[in-house]
């Protein structure tokens, strides 16, 4: 779920335009997924040798994205933030005739972040909004869990807007002293009206104005690989529209639970929210 710009402006150092441009010139060609098999991370697992047809692979009962490399097929598995540390299992092959392959999930500690929200309804919503919030949650879950079986040639992503990275993925958030869901995206502080662009090719799967997220756009990149941008001032796309990498999805704003204009960007794999920084070139993420 989307959250807000942190009050602590020093949480992440500012990235200047000049430094960003220099980093892009040197790193664009190297951009690729950087697997990190931890809770909230991504595991990449070799599952079939070169020359074999694309296998079926599932994790926790859900189909996962397959990418083709020189040595064959690799499963790209999203790991939810509540994934237990230790040995995990994927199933390879059709249901009823599959084999198990194990991999190991390592530990990762995410920092705590305490924030003060002026509008108490955005911390503890009134009773007459609870049905709306529950319906929106279920609708978003369905959208991000959808598996559109199309080839995915690239799993690297572009940052949807250039700016100061103001809040990292996975922060354990406490609003007005009340523990709430962890931060499941990457925040970029940008002025209202800043163009927000598609991080990769895809199809727009949801455009809506949601209670917490505000104006929101989901883009389905295929095989359960989904991006979401929210807190927009306005959306400029429609459901079902095909978008290309870099195409404008909308304008940055502060709709929903936000104290100032910024981009919140979430990435999902096989239904799990994962760290978007793993999909962008390191100089842009760090």
Give the label of every model feature segment.
Residues 14-26:
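Bacterial N-terminal signal peptides
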Residues 158-286:
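Catalytic cores of peptidoglycan-degrading enzymes
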Residues 1-10:
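N-terminal secretory signal peptides that target proteins for export/translocation
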């Amino acid at each position: 779920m989307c959250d807000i710009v942190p009050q602590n402006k020093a949480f992440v150092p500012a990235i200047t335009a000049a430094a960003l441009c220099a980093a892009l010139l040197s790193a664009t060609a190297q951009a690729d997924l950087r697997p990190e098999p931890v809770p909230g991370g991504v595991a990449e697992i070799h599952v079939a040798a070169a020359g074999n047809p694309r296998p079926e692979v599932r994790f926790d009962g859900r189909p996962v994205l397959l990418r083709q490399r020189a040595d064959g097929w690799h499963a790209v598995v999203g790991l939810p933030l509540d994934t237990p540390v230790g040995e995990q299992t994927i199933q390879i092959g059709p249901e009823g005739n599959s084999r198990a392959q194990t991999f190991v999930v390592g530990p990762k500690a995410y920092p705590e972040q305490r924030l003060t929200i002026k509008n108490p309804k955005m911390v503890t919503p009134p009773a007459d909004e609870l049905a709306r919030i529950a319906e929106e949650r279920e609708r978003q879950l369905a959208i991000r869990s959808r598996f559109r079986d199309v080839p995915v040639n690239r799993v690297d992503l572009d940052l949807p807007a250039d700016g100061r990275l103001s809040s990292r993925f996975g922060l354990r958030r406490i609003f007005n002293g009340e523990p709430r869901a962890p931060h499941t995206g990457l925040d970029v502080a940008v002025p209202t009206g800043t163009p927000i662009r598609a991080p990769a090719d895809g199809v727009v799967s949801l455009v809506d104005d949601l209670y917490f997220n505000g104006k929101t756009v989901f883009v389905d990149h295929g095989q359960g690989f989904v991006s979401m941008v929210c807190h927009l001032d306005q959306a400029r796309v429609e459901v079902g529209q095909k978008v290309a990498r870099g195409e404008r999805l909308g304008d940055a704003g502060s709709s929903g639970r936000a104290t100032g204009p910024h981009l919140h960007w979430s990435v999902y794999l096989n239904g799990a929210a994962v760290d978007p920084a793993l999909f962008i070139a390191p100089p842009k993420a760090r």
